[in-house]
Every structure is written in C-alpha cells, then in structure tokens.
Amino acid sequence: MSKVWSFQRWLIAFFMAFLSVSYANASDQVQNQETAKSKGKILVVMTNHSAYPTRSDKTGLWLTELTHFYDVAKAAGYDMDFVSPQGGVVPLDERSMKPIYVDKSARKLLADRQFMYRLNHTLAPSSIDPTHYKAIYYTGGHGTMWDFPDNKELKNISESIYRQGGIVSAVCHGVGGLLPLVGEDGKPLISGRTVTGFANKEETLSGIKSQVPFSLQNSLINHGAKYKQGFLPFTSYVVSDDR
C-alpha cells in the first residue's frame, strides 16, 4: 500500500453519487462538534486486526481512508458512529502514518482528543441498532482482510441497513466486508453488480501479496460481482451500482 491515495477526489465522487451535500454551520465553542441539525447517521466500520503473518511491521486501519470520509460526511451534515468487529481500540497501519500520507486533515484529527477517544473506544457490533443509520461505510487497510468477511454481526447490520433503504459502501480492502452480504433473493448482494477494490496487481506491487489470507479481487469475482479497476494502479477509482 506504499502510495499516495487520491481519496479526496474519490470521496467527492462518492457523495455526488449518493448524498446531497449541504454545509451546516458548525459551533466554534466545541472542537469537532457535530452539526446542529443532523441529516442522519452513518456507521463507519474499522478493523481491530494489526498483525501480518510474517512481517514485523503492523497493519490496521489506513488512516486517511477514515479521515477524508469523516471530513466530507461531517461537512454534509451527517453524524457518525465508529464500530469495529471486537469494539475498542483500532490499530493504525504503520505505513499509513508516514509523513507522505498524513495530510493536513489527518494531522488535525490526530490532534483532536475527542476524535482519538472515539477511535480508541469504538462500539461493538452487539451495541448497534441498524435502524439508526442511513448508510454503512467500510474503511480499508490490510487488517480488514482478517476480521471483516467472517463477522456475522457486521453482516447482519449491513444487510439490515440495505433492506431498509440505506447505502452500503466500502473503500480499498474494506470491500471485503461486502463479501458475506446476502440479498433478499438469497444471492450474494454484490452478485451482478459493478464493484471495485484493491486489485491483485496492487497487492503484488505493494509487496503484501504473500501476507493476505485471500485475493480480494478474485473473491469479488467469485461472488458474482462485475469487478472493475483503474487503468493505473494506486490511483483514484470509484464505482457505484444501486446503493
């Protein structure tokens, strides 16, 4: 994952497709205070997994795949809850913390005590009521490959949000969280739908191919998805199909 992500463009494209963006007046009295009139809640999913099989460095959440989304969603008037498969602390991928990747937005949130408290005290899936959310967003980072696909509680939450008319979305390796989802017809939710996600060639180029438990690209295709990827690796690429 050694690259510079263009997630601001990705996020703008995503929200142009799915959300009507309107900027609310934020209070100057409390740092990081949620907008006064919320348009609803988004459930943001993050990994608890930090260990590679043989590498000494640690994986986890790729930081800006959270921070860029957080900034855009908050500016659009949405509240967010943070959840992880086990609840509690979310590890940060070591490489995502390098200066080349940590931009102004990420630095600001890293210095925000309230934001960091939430990152270190994420909710457990058992505490989530899906009816409270208009969308669910799976963040990325290699850690998600271990604890997103097999989590039955997150699966049930996502399916409930979708069936009540909500949006199911993901970025990068977080797309693995969509693999177990099943539609009302009993078929994989992504079957027949256009999706994207971290590509095989990107795993090879990033040097992590031998570490991950499965190929995300192959698994998406095996679940019936119409997999698409950008012409160049590690560049901004977004697709949407229904919600």
How should each PLM-predicted stretch be described?
Residues 1-11:
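Bacterial N-terminal signal peptides that target proteins for export
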Residues 3, 25-28:
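Intrinsically disordered, low-complexity polyampholyte segments enriched for Lys and acidic residues
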Residues 11-22:
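Bacterial N-terminal signal peptides
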Residues 27-164, 176-243:
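Extended, subdomain-level signal for the structured scaffold at the beginning of enzyme domains
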Residues 167:
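Active-site cofactor/cluster-binding pocket
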Residues 171-174:
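Short, thiol/selenol-centered motifs that function as redox-active sites or metal-ligating centers
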